[in-house]
């Protein structure tokens, strides 16, 4: 329970207020985490409402299974499986989808999960430690080119090539030093390469973010779930997404803008704009944590919440 108590759900009231438009509707929490949003949604639902939550983390599933509410069910899988998982339950349309992206505080704060450079632990970084390739396993085989691309594209790290070369050089010493399999050593290697410091940021921040995103396929899964949410939302249904870094937010912003804009019409063609299909989404708002929330929970500082509504059947 300690981690659950320490974890503070970001933009809790604002997200649920924006999401729940019909108390008797069917809602999806794509990232259960420690259940802050899910519990708040359930508190707003009528007896006929339903909430289906998703999470890859076995510990999140354990927490979810303690919720004794007939209106609630949990799916141990990525939110990228949302379309198929709901179809298997006979659900074709939902009243709202909530996505709280990124890694949760309990995951970061547990050195055994391998997400943090602040405490030494096994180099894992998987949201679900029972599935897929760990960070250490990927680092043991990735080429300089692949490492460079991941660290550059997912970490927006300008020293990506130098870090990649240092990681491959360390791998060449595995017979003498053993495998690179701890967060502490990874952070140390990056720190030797990245000499400049961003204010308030550890030199390893961008590299750890990049490797975590790659290992968990976070951006690919995000694109899949956005497409699924668009097709699942009923008319008037809401899509609410909380992002914590620019890569995620850029994808969400572009997705919402693309589906809230009417298609361009070539003036040379005999087509009137009014004759074209209406865009399926309407952008409702963009919100940020209040100053008071950031003071109480510094990890909320980088959060941005975007809300869109389905306006076509």
From Swiss-Prot:
GO cellular component: cytoplasm
Domain of life, per lineage: Bacteria
EC number in record: 2.1.1.199
UniProt keyword Lipoprotein, yes or no: no
InterPro entries xref list: RsmH, SAM-dep_MeTrfase_MraW_recog, SAM-dependent_MTases_sf
Record has rRNA processing as a keyword: yes
UniProt binding sites for S-adenosyl-L-methionine: 35-37, 55, 79, 100, 107
One Pfam family hit: Methyltransf_5
Substrates-to-products reaction catalysed: cytidine(1402) in 16S rRNA + S-adenosyl-L-methionine = N(4)-methylcytidine(1402) in 16S rRNA + S-adenosyl-L-homocysteine + H(+)
SUPFAM superfamilies: Putative methyltransferase TM0872, insert domain, S-adenosyl-L-methionine-dependent methyltransferases
Similarity annotation: Belongs to the methyltransferase superfamily. RsmH family.
Function of the protein: Specifically methylates the N4 position of cytidine in position 1402 (C1402) of 16S rRNA.
Name the record gives this protein: Ribosomal RNA small subunit methyltransferase H
Organism: Burkholderia ambifaria (strain ATCC BAA-244 / DSM 16087 / CCUG 44356 / LMG 19182 / AMMD)
């Amino acid at each position: 329970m300690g981690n659950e108590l320490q974890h503070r759900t970001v933009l809790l009231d604002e997200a649920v207020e924006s999401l729940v438009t019909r108390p008797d509707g069917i809602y999806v929490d794509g990232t259960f985490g420690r259940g802050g949003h899910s519990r708040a949604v359930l508190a707003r639902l009528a007896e006929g409402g339903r909430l289906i939550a998703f999470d890859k983390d076995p510990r999140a599933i354990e927490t979810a299974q303690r919720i004794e509410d007939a209106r609630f069910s949990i799916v141990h899988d990525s939110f990228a499986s949302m379309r198929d998982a709901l179809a298997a339950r006979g659900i074709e349309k939902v009243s709202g989808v909530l996505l709280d992206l990124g890694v949760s505080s309990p995951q970061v704060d547990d050195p055994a999960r391998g997400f943090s450079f602040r405490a030494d632990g096994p180099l894992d970084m998987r949201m679900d430690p029972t599935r897929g390739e760990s960070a250490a396993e990927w680092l043991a085989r990735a080429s300089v080119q692949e490492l460079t691309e991941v660290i550059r594209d997912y970490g927006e790290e300008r020293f990506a090539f130098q870090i990649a070369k240092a990681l491959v050089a360390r791998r060449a010493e595995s017979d003498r030093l053993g495998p690179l399999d701890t967060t502490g050593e990874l952070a140390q290697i990056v720190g030797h390469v990245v000499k400049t410091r961003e204010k308030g940021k550890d030199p390893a921040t961008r590299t750890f973010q990049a490797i975590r995103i790659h290992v968990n396929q976070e951006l690919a899964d995000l694109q899949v779930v956005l497409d699924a949410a668009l097709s699942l939302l009923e008319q008037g249904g809401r899509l609410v997404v909380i992002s914590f870094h620019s890569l995620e937010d850029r994808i969400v912003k572009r997705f919402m803008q693309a589906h809230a804009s009417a298609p361009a019409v070539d003036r040379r063609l005999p087509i009137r704009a009014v004759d074209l299909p209406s865009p399926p989404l309407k952008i409702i708002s963009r919100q940020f944590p209040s100053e008071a929330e950031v003071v109480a929970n510094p990890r909320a500082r980088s959060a941005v919440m975007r809300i869109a509504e389905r306006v076509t059947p």
